[in-house]
Amino acid sequence: MIQRKQTLFLLLAVIVCALGLFFPIGSIAPEGMGTDSMVYNLGVVTGEGGLAISATCIPLFVLLSVTAILSLVTIFLYKNRKVQMSICKCTMLLQVLWVIDYVLILLGIIPIPEVQGKMGIEFAACLPIVSPILVAMAYKGVNDDEKLVKAADRIR
């Protein structure tokens, strides 16, 4: 299981998603005077130090959590490559939905009502963007394994 390259890619995807859950994905500079508020996948930490769980951010948290869990589950389905490939496709779709939701929040189309101001990007917002690349590489590895098994079956 661990010697397969797609296992390493999926494990890296899990780690990247988990890190993305715990680090800020954006900062909001207030319109007036004050300190910046940090936006996490679950909510907003205001400049005064208060935590506000935002309904706007909950879909980000759910999508990234499900993505991490699906990537972890996919690692242990190494005996069933077809299911592994379909879960990889679903995982990539969820990650694309996360990126779309984040961009809508970043552009202000979906506002965060807890704080007002201009939102900026933080480093952790790049982590869920790297994750679909890792899952796509894992998908390619699983697909190559499937082709190899089919070729071996034809030889017999």
Where do the model's predicted regions map?
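N-terminal signal-anchor transmembrane alpha helix
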Residues: R4-S27
